[in-house]
Amino acid sequence: MLSVRVAAALARALPRQSGLVSKKALGAAFVATRNIHASGVWPPEKSGTAEVSSILEERILGADTTADLEETGRVLSIGDGIARVYGLRNVQAEEMVEFSSGLKGMSLNLEPDNVGVVGLANDKLIKEGDIVKRTGAIVDVPVGDELLGRVVDALGNTIDGKGPIGSKTRRRVGLKAPGIIPRISVREPMQTGIKAVDSLVPIGRGQRELIIGDRQTGKTSIAIDTIINQKRFNDGTDEKKKLYCIYVAIGQKRLTDADAMKYTIVVSRTASDAAPLQYLAPYSGCSMGEYFRDNGTHALIIYDDLSKQAVAYRQMSLLLRRPPGREAYPGDVFYLHSRLLERAAKMNDHFGGGSLTALPVIETQAGDVSAYIPTNVISITDGQIFLETELFYKGIRPAINVGLSVSRVGSAAQTRAMKQVAGTMKLELAQYREVAAFAQFGSDLDAATQQLLNRGVRLTELLKQGQYVPMAIEEQVTVIYAGVRGHLDKMEPSKITKFESAFLAHVKSQHQELLATIRADGKISEQADAKLKEIVLNFLSTFEA
């Protein structure tokens, strides 16, 4: 007779032989034995032992032996937003981890005996001894058209109070930049609507153009005006002309102006936010922009500003005990910005023909462009727009220094009409600045020098532009044409601004067909040139009167 005791021993032996040691399995064996014993089929028939064994084996193998395994560690120390965690042997760099309090962190330092984790929120809820578990996910953010018109934080969470984002697509924040093969040279214009930029330092789609200057010189104004100017293209039906915008505010005051929000994503990180979030925000915004680039459309991303991101990264690195270098920045601070800005690209037709244009902003101290971070970013980008405090206080706004500002690849993308009228303007303005410095020492100037000074003063006045009033490219062409061709040389400089607004109003109301021709053809034909000259001269005769 097979006793319950023997059956129990058999139940213990079976799973041990098959490598399945489980309380559930043992329990199933006991239940099976009890059921057989209760059925009263004793003594068993000749093959009873084999039947009992097979029944027990079926019950044991049918038991649920799955278990949720989690790799965990413990907090050794916590301070200044940095947690030292013991364990987590297989954690990846920049992997999200979760503390027992529910707060998220990101692993940055992978050391032999511990992991340095930066907290992505208030670290007051983290204590020594807390359990930390891996999530297995590298930091990623939601991407897609659903984000347009929304304000999100560095992790893609909404902070505008308009409910959750419906996007199902997510993308890692730290993706590799496209290589040489998928790219093509910059050839399409990215119009800012600012006369001084579109004529002198043109930007192309897929370019990286740095906006650099001291604080309070109008860097953010140029960026915001560029976003507002895209309204004229995004309101149209041509998808190839549309330019979606991502504005990454790093450590800036909270953005309240919602102009042109329907085609814009705002990634907001204020100065009061944790350093890791200020560090992540540009990469998050870049991933959102890459979604449009890789789907054959065009996007513009503005990083306002990368100086604050570098400071946040320096703060994190020093707290993680990484070796400091020049100006106490870590050795890889160049890589911090290069891996971000290299993701801006113009893709070839085989890869969809999309583009991502980057306008990084860098703040200088007392105009010192030779500091560490400014020189790094200047060497990475394809040109820079240099803003001067002195020009700003003189009332020349935007305060662009024409001599120091340059666009290395954008001229290939400049429209032919603008090239025709603005081709000589940069040279004339540079000569004017040079001569003006010497002219103040003496009054005996020859006629050619006097002419150069007169033209330079009027062109400088003509390039002044108010904030939040970007101009269409055909309107810019007509105004600059009047100045470059010498039609304004005899006008008082103080009247130039008044002339510009009156002339534009006249052209828009009376000569729409000329504007449409310049916009459609992208150039000034001989007939259009003659017509434009006639319009300017006729208007001047009535304006002067």
Curated annotation (Swiss-Prot):
The gene coding this protein: atp5f1a
Domain of life from the UniProt record: Eukaryota
Species name: Xenopus laevis (African clawed frog)
Site (Required for activity): S405
InterPro entries, A to Z: ATP_synth_asu-like_sf (IPR023366), ATP_synth_asu_C (IPR000793), ATP_synth_asu_C_sf (IPR038376), ATP_synth_F1_a_nt-bd_dom (IPR033732), ATP_synth_F1_asu (IPR005294), ATPase_a/bsu_AS (IPR020003), ATPase_F1/V1/A1_a/bsu_N (IPR004100), ATPase_F1/V1/A1_a/bsu_N_sf (IPR036121)
Similarity annotation: Belongs to the ATPase alpha/beta chains family.
Topology with respect to the bilayer: Peripheral membrane protein
Assembly, per entry: Homotrimer. Component of the ATP synthase complex composed at least of ATP5F1A/subunit alpha, ATP5F1B/subunit beta, ATP5MC1/subunit c (homooctomer), MT-ATP6/subunit a, MT-ATP8/subunit 8, ATP5ME/subunit e, ATP5MF/subunit f, ATP5MG/subunit g, ATP5MK/subunit k, ATP5MJ/subunit j, ATP5F1C/subunit gamma, ATP5F1D/subunit delta, ATP5F1E/subunit epsilon, ATP5PF/subunit F6, ATP5PB/subunit b, ATP5PD/subunit d, ATP5PO/subunit OSCP.
Predominant localisation class: mitochondrion
Function: Subunit alpha, of the mitochondrial membrane ATP synthase complex (F(1)F(0) ATP synthase or Complex V) that produces ATP from ADP in the presence of a proton gradient across the membrane which is generated by electron transport complexes of the respiratory chain. ATP synthase complex consist of a soluble F(1) head domain - the catalytic core - and a membrane F(1) domain - the membrane proton channel. These two domains are linked by a central stalk rotating inside the F(1) region and a stationary peripheral stalk.
UniProt-listed NCBIfam families: atpA (TIGR00962), PRK13343.1 (NF009884)
An annotated Gene Ontology molecular function: ATP binding
GO annotation, cellular component aspect: mitochondrial inner membrane; proton-transporting ATP synthase complex
The protein, known as: ATP synthase F(1) complex subunit alpha, mitochondrial
Residues that, per the record, bind ATP: Q216, G218, K219, T220, S221, Q465, Q467
Keywords: ATP synthesis, ATP-binding, CF(1), Hydrogen ion transport, Ion transport, Magnesium, Membrane, Metal-binding, Mitochondrion, Mitochondrion inner membrane, Nucleotide-binding, Transit peptide, Transport
Subcellular location as annotated: Mitochondrion inner membrane
Binding site for Mg(2+): T220, D304
